[in-house]
Amino acid sequence: MSDMRRLMILFLLVGLAVVLSGCATLSVHSKVNKDGSVESYKLVINTSSFVYGLLAEGAKKEGYESLRESFLSEIPEEMRDKVSYDEVWSGDQVSIIIEARDYVPADDDKVKIRKENGFLIYEDLSFASENNQTSSNELGNALLSSFSLHYYLEMPGKIVESNANVVKDNKAEWHLTGASAFNTRIYAKSEVPGIPGFEAALAIVGLLAAGLLFGRVKG
């Protein structure tokens, strides 16, 4: 299992713990580079101080001083310089912010990026159940009814195909609630921008080559 996949599983476990403990909103902000690497993948969990207290209490029972320490202890050592953890408080509400930066998804990661026929294809299967069906369990649906997922994706080029709720230029948004948030495959297909100035450089090289060829013929 790749380090990034382990980290993604950890992200989801934290999010799931919050969901099962009470109402919550989960936001994902993902930004992709034109070479297919991920510039940043940020997870923001917004919940109440009560739910946070339950999670912190669970962490202390496991021998950790805080929820932060509990989370950071699970991150592979080679990934620690690429991952940050922050908490932002506002009255009775808290935002848990976890971000990974500058990594290339492995083949077994939930986040998959590939180049195909001149396009860049992005998929995130983190929120797609294996059978892709909404649970019929009444208790499960009740627990998830207060859950919201907001996913924001920024691709390096214009998005030409996606299952997002909103698409504008190189950005896409998904806004999901309840059990449907865990039955969704995040998908987008974008153009791959050229290297700035590359076309101009080719034109200059072409003109120089033509000039040399013309000079030789004339000579």
UniProtKB/Swiss-Prot annotation:
Subcellular locations according to the entry: Cell membrane
Superkingdom, taxonomy of origin: Archaea
KW Cell cycle (keyword) present: no
Residue ranges of the TM segments: 8-28, 194-214
Membrane topology classification: Multi-pass membrane protein
Cellular-component GO terms for this entry: plasma membrane
Alphabetic keyword roster: Cell membrane, Membrane, Transmembrane, Transmembrane helix
Protein name: Uncharacterized protein AF_1487
